Amino acid sequence: MTSLFNLKDKNAIITGSSRGIGKAIAYRMAEHGAKVIITSRKIDACENVAEEINSTFGKDTATAISCNISDKEQLKNLYVKSKEFCGSITTLVCNA
């Protein structure tokens, strides 16, 4: 059966994706072919989710970047590191 949702060549930043709904969104987007940036304030939690996604869907499907979205400098860093990881951002999920 062909997937109804082809996210190949899509790159998503998902805020608050180290647990709960954000983690589920990241997992499903990766399942359908997207590269995902896992972000929250807690880098250890982000890294765990990214490792889980990468082990399930392949190396370099996910990366972890710590970010407090209320801090402008951290947001700039999130953008720069995300572009380094995947080249462009096609999707932003504001879950935090």
Language-model segments: which ranges?
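Conserved glycine-rich cofactor-binding loop
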Residues: N11, S18-G20
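Rossmann-fold scaffold of SDR-type NAD(P)-dependent oxidoreductases
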Residues: T15, I89-A96
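Hydrophobic/aromatic anchor residues within beta-strands of the central parallel beta-sheet
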Residues: A62-A64
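Conserved glycine-rich Rossmann-like NAD(P)H-binding loop of the short-chain dehydrogenase/reductase
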Residues: H32-V49
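Aromatic pocket-lining residues of Rossmann-like dinucleotide-binding sites
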Residues: M29
